[in-house]
């Protein structure tokens, strides 16, 4: 799927930076088996992310880490993001954590609100099947169709839209203005999650070498929040299911910019190791009747 979706889009300027950064011939060729793990080195940012995982997930994921170690990988604990106490919310995913700390110029939400206002206007300008052309139009439509679109928060509106359209209203308030606070927040979030964040943790290999990846628990939402702020890739491997809820969870690898091929290599090697071992913590196959069957449309005449 990655091979099918990557590549620059001339209509989407954000994609142009990948030119020259992707592997020639695609990502499939980077797939590896468990033997590739020998002499690989991974870091565990325990205080940055792992402490927020529940004990059951910690136990399962650490069993997989032990498998990796047995396969020849080196595991280094304590490879922390230097600014994790500042940028990682202890209470779960929170993209306005900077404002909660009293610093809107250190909040991801500060620039997300502005970017959304401008980008949704650009997107709507190309649609031909609607008269809605701006965030103002969307907000007005939601108010006019409160029962189905959730314009008002509960109890003024419907409980299905408990907070109404608070995100839209917050974005609307910015009017898309990229002011000094916008640029301060953007610079802070990118710097503290990139060179002073993930990149710094990846540099904590033995003898001043770099790590092949950071191992993180992706059910801890702060992991992908930090990666998203940095614009860095994360890949998740199936790991297990919660005993009480039956909900699945995974083990994730985090890397720096343009390191998708590295993540594909190590994720495929770990998954091969899971299947080659006796561990129950791996991708589970469907067991329902007929899951291998394919529905084929049949045209009946007359």
Regions found by a protein language model. Name each.
Residues 13-24, 83-105, 206-207, 289-300:
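Surface-exposed intrinsically disordered loops and tails
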Residues 55-57, 88-111, 224-225, 229:
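Short glycine/threonine-rich loop-to-helix capping motif typified by GTGT followed
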Residues 29-49, 96-196, 238, 244-251:
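Short helix-loop capping/hinge segments that flank enzyme active sites or metal/cofactor-binding pockets
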Residues 48-52, 81-86, 102, 109, ...:
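Solvent-exposed loop/turn segments at secondary-structure junctions
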Residues 5, 62, 163-302:
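Glycine-rich, small-residue loops and helix-cap segments
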Residues 1-59, 276-301:
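A short helix-breaking turn/cap at a secondary-structure junction
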Residues 1-26, 51-86, 105-147:
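Acidic-enriched catalytic cores of C-N bond-cleaving enzymes acting on peptides and small amides
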């Amino acid at each position: 799927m990655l091979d099918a979706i990557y590549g620059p889009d001339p209509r989407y300027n954000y994609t142009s930076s990948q030119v020259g950064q992707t592997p020639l011939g695609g990502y499939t060729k980077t797939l590896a088996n468990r033997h590739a793990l020998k002499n690989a080195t991974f870091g565990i940012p325990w205080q940055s992310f792992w402490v927020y995982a529940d004990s059951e997930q910690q136990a399962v994921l650490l069993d997989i880490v032990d498998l990796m170690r047995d396969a020849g990988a080196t595991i280094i604990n304590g490879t922390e993001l230097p600014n994790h106490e500042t940028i990682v919310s202890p209470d779960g995913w929170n993209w306005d954590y900077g404002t909660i700390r009293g610093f809107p110029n250190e909040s991801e939400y500060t620039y997300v609100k502005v970017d959304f206002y401008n980008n949704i206007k650009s997107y709507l300008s190309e649609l031909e099947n609607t008269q809605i052309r701006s965030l103002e139009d969307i907000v007005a439509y939601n108010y006019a169709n409160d029962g189905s679109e959730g314009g008002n928060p509960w109890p003024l509106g419907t409980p299905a839209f408990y907070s109404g359209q608070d995100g839209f209203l917050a974005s609307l308030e910015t009017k898309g203005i990229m002011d000094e606070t916008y640029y301060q927040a953007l610079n802070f979030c990118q710097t503290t999650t990139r060179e002073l964040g993930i990149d710094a943790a990846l540099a904590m290999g033995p003898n001043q070498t770099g790590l092949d990846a950071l191992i993180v628990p992706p059910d801890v939402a702060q992991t992908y929040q930090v990666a998203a702020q940095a614009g860095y890739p994360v890949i998740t491997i199936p790991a297990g299911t919660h005993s009480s809820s039956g909900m699945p969870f995974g083990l994730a690898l985090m890397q720096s910019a343009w390191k998708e091929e590295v993540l594909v290599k190590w994720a495929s090697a770990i998954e091969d190791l899971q299947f080659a071992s006796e561990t129950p913590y791996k991708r589970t196959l469907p067991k329902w009747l007929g899951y291998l069957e394919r529905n084929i449309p049949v045209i009946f005449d007359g």
